[in-house]
Structures are given as structure tokens and as C-alpha cells.
């Protein structure tokens, strides 16, 4: 855990920088979205920056790039939720930013082309350029670039999540998964789309690229563990702990596609186990395991995970993740409490 002693202060500085940028956004609605995301998604940024512990040497530019990318992702997800005439087209256009953030150069798209509000004062392009700048410092970036861009393009599936009619949404997601993962039966269609929504496979590739000695086999083996297993675990656990709020707000919940609560818990346990076990088998496996279990602990540390209806499942999931969550969960709960106190 000593690695967090330098990562977290760097994250705090980056978040403060982006908060000042968000506060200067001319359009009041975009300004509210950007500011609210930086307030509510701080743990997401800290989780992204945790990937900076993978390289043996400290790489501050990697942290800055990871935070910028995660901040852009959270902001885009919120923008995609706003109803508009071309909602799916709008979401796909907005999410172009994720792939372009991983391209070393090139003209940026008009991300707000189909969005009802446009004047962000350069906020989203600045996030994209900050992520690009982080990539440019990585000595082995060319070895991971194509896989990273492919991961970013998969994340466009998030645009389908916000379709106003559940029947059309589910049909679109099912068709997308059938096309993208034809012949692969490790996961159900909704588990594939859940995995594709996650940025964790992108983050591990960026972290590996910080090592000038990284080999192609190391990259491919890590990619195979993070996508689909770690990515699926991340999105599904997020849905697991947010079940009640998603129902109340009418949001799409991936875990509602399971046939029963028992099946949901069984599958979550299996996917979490595959994530953590696979991470341990990688080169520098202890650090990958720290990240995989840290992700599990981040979600299970949420207060809703300890509600009477979820607590038995929470305990079972934490158990299959091994011994590290016993240390990580109290730390994550404390971090959440400190954040709430700071916001009071």
C-alpha cells in the first residue's frame, strides 16, 4: 500500500486542476455536469491512477494521463444520458474522444456535433490532449497502441445503454455483442457488453507501456485477463452495489439480466475469481492482484453493499477475491468517509 503515498497526492492535484477547468466552462449545463462528475467520481480517478503502481519506476505523467482519461470517460457517460433527438448517434459521436485520446496526433472530432449543448470552453478537448500527452511519455506506447484504441472503441457501446426504451436498448446491446464476440461463449451477451464498457483494459495497457522492456507476450497475456474478466467484474460489481438506486431512477442495470439473485451471485463470484486468479498469474502478478482486488474492494466498500439485502452476497464475493480485500475494504471505507466529511 506504500505506493498510494505518492499516487494519491498526484491524483488530488490533477482533480483540483480539472475542477478549475470545469468551473470555467461557459455553458451552465455542461459546467454542472463536469463539476458534478469530478465531485462524485473521485474514487474512479483514484482507481484509474492505481495502475501507476504496475511499473517498477514512478511515472507521474502516467498518473496524469490516467486521471485525464477517466475524467473524460465519466463526463462522456453523463453527457450521453441527456435525452436528445439523436441520442445513440450523439453518444457514439461523444465517445470518439476516447479513441482519439489514445492517438498520438491528429485532428479532434466535433464531439458535440449532435449534442444539445456545445460550449464547454475547450474542456473535453483539453482532457483528450492531456491523455495524449501522457501517452507520448510512455517508452513502449507503440507496442500497446492498437490494442488500446480497440479497447476505447469497444467503450462506444455505452452509447447504447441510454436508449429510452428498454426493449430497443436490450435488443441493440444483444445484437452488438453477437456481432463483436461471435463464437465466444465464456460470457453471456450482457456480460460481454458490461466488460466492453470498462476502461480497465485500456489502463493496464498504458501502465505496461511505461516499461521500456515490456514484451509482446506480457501485453497479450495481460489483455486476455483484463478483457473480459477484470473489465466484466468492474461493471457488474458497479451494477450490483447500485441495484436499488438504478431501480429507483430507471437506469439500466446489467445484473437485472440474470435469471435469479442466486445466479447473479454465482456468476459474480466466478468472474471475480477469474479476475483475481488470472491477475496473480501475470508477470508482476502481486501488483496486478493489488489492482484487481482493489477494484473489487472499491465497489464493495460502498454503503449499499452492506445493506441487509446485499450483505451476504458482498461477503461471499469478497471471500473469493482472497485475503487482500480484508486490508483494502477498511481503507476504502475510510476514504469514502473522509470524502463525505470534506464535502460537508
Residues covered by each model-derived region:
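All-alpha helical catalytic cores of prenyl diphosphate-utilizing isoprenoid enzymes
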Residues: 8, 14-48, 62-63, 93-244, ...
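Post-signal peptide N-terminal segment of secreted/secretory-pathway proteins
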Residues: 48-60
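Acidic (Asp/Glu-rich) catalytic motifs at the cytosolic membrane interface
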Residues: 72-83, 234-245
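Short, glycine/acidic-rich hinge or "gate" loops at secondary-structure transitions
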Residues: 80-92
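Active/binding-pocket-proximal capping segment
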Residues: 243-258, 314
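C-terminal, helix-dominated tail/subdomain
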Residues: 252-277, 291-302
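Transmembrane helix-loop-helix
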Residues: 282-294
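Acidic, carboxylate-rich catalytic segments that either coordinate divalent cations
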Residues: 294-344
Amino acid at each position: 500500500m506504500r505506493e498510494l503515498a505518492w499516487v494519491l497526492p498526484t491524483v488530488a492535484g490533477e482533480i483540483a486542476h480539472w475542477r478549475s477547468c470545469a468551473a470555467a466552462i461557459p455553458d451552465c449545463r455542461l459546467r454542472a455536469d463536469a463539476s458534478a462528475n469530478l465531485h462524485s467520481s473521485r474514487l474512479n480517478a483514484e482507481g484509474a491512477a492505481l495502475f501507476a503502481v504496475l511499473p517498477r519506476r514512478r511515472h507521474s505523467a502516467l498518473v496524469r494521463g490516467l486521471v485525464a482519461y477517466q475524467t473524460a470517460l465519466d463526463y462522456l457517460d453523463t453527457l450521453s444520458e441527456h435525452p436528445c433527438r439523436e441520442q445513440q448517434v450523439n453518444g457514439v459521436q461523444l465517445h470518439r474522444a476516447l479513441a482519439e485520446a489514445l492517438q498520438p496526433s491528429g485532428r479532434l472530432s466535433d464531439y458535440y456535433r449532435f449534442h444539445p449543448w456545445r460550449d464547454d470552453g475547450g474542456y473535453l478537448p483539453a482532457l483528450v490532449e492531456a491523455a495524449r500527452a501522457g501517452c507520448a511519455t510512455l517508452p513502449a506506447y507503440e507496442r500497446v497502441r492498437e490494442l488500446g484504441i480497440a479497447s476505447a472503441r469497444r467503450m462506444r457501446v455505452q452509447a447504447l445503454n441510454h436508449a429510452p426504451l428498454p426493449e430497443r436498448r436490450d435488443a441493440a446491446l444483444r445484437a452488438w455483442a453477437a456481432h463483436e464476440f461471435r463464437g465466444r461463449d465464456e460470457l453471456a451477451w450482457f456480460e460481454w457488453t458490461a466488460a466492453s464498457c470498462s476502461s480497465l483494459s485500456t489502463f493496464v495497457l498504458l501502465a505496461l507501456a511505461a516499461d521500456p522492456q515490456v514484451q509482446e507476450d506480457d501485453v497479450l497475456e495481460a489483455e486476455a485477463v483484463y478483457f473480459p474478466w477484470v473489465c466484466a467484474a468492474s461493471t457488474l460489481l458497479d451494477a450490483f452495489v447500485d441495484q436499488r438506486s438504478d431501480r429507483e431512477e430507471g437506469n439500466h442495470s446489467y445484473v437485472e439480466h440474470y435469471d435469479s439473485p442466486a445466479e447473479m451471485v454465482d456468476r459474480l463470484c466466478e468472474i471475480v475469481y477469474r479476475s483475481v486468479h488470472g491477475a496473480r498469474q501475470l508477470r508482476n502478478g502481486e501488483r496486478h492482484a493489488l489492482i484487481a482486488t482493489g477494484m473489487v474492494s472499491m465497489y464493495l466498500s460502498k454503503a449499499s453493499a452492506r445493506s441487509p439485502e446485499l450483505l451476504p452476497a458482498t461477503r461471499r464475493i469478497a471471500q473469493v477475491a482472497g485475503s487482500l480485500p480484508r486490508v483494502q475494504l477498511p481503507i476504502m471505507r475510510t476514504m469514502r468517509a473522509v470524502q463525505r466529511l470534506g464535502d460537508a
